[in-house]
Regions:
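Conserved Rossmann-fold NAD(P)-dependent oxidoreductase catalytic core, especially the SDR/UDP-sugar
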Residues: 1-39
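Conserved SDR Rossmann-fold cofactor-binding beta-strand/turn motif
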Residues: 12-13, 66-72
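A short C-terminal helix-loop "cap" of Rossmann-like NAD(P)-dependent dehydrogenase/epimerase domains
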Residues: 27-35, 59, 73-93, 142-148
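Active-site Tyr-X1-5-Lys
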Residues: 37-65
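Conserved N-terminal glycine/acidic-rich loop preference
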Residues: 42-49, 77, 84, 162
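Alpha-helical substrate-binding/gating segment
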Residues: 73-90, 95-122
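C-terminal substrate-binding subdomain of Rossmann-fold SDR/epimerase-dehydratase oxidoreductases
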Residues: 103-181
Length: 181
């Protein structure tokens, strides 16, 4: 801040949403309106980073800090293991079957820098799909039957809502395990 930096994009985490979901989330898809529920030391640190960002922008009205709550970051080399997730969907229940291709994560950082406004905002950053072939509605019915769905789920859509990032940042995932030959 002393160096005159006015735009900051920080790597936050999906873990603020309650991962590993030993306690059911109250609704799905999860979004930024869901209050932080850190369940690990790592998540507590990410929560404190976001709280610090809120204080910094309060002290400096021209400062822009964006917290990108990245899902589990993957590279194309990781996609070879994804078919095994479909054989055992419970193995990825811990983060609602979410992921983010590292290249799309980079796109989100660029979009956040380009669209920065004074203040602090958070965005869930995930791919548009899940890591398994099982439809998302079926995953929720099987593994989280008591969790309210805020809307009808289609196909393998992500259960970590990226709607705010799409709307405000122009973020749209371009890479993913289904597109990799």
């Amino acid at each position: 801040i002393r160096a005159g930096i006015r735009r900051i994009v920080m790597a936050s985490s999906e873990t603020l949403l309650g991962i590993p979901f030993d306690i059911d989330p109250p609704y799905a898809p999860l979004d930024e309106e869901y209050p932080s529920r850190p369940e690990s030391t790592y998540a507590i640190v990410k929560h404190l980073e976001e709280e610090l960002a809120r204080k910094l922008v309060r002290w400096d009205a021209e400062l822009s800090i964006t917290g990108l709550r990245f899902s589990n970051v993957m590279t194309p080399d990781d996609y070879a293991q994804f078919p095994d997730y479909s054989k055992n969907p419970s193995s990825r229940r811990w983060n609602l079957w979410g992921y983010i291709d590292a290249r799309d994560g980079a796109q989100a950082v660029l979009r956040a820098l380009e669209t920065a406004k004074p203040g602090f905002e958070t965005y869930v950053i995930a791919n548009a799909d899940t890591v398994v072939d099982t439809p998302s509605a079926e995953l929720m019915a099987t593994f989280f039957p008591d969790v309210e769905l805020t809307r009808e789920l289609t196909g393998n859509e992500t259960l970590l809502s990226i709607e705010k990032a799409r709307r405000e940042l122009g973020y749209e995932p371009k890479f993913g395990w289904r597109q990799t030959p």
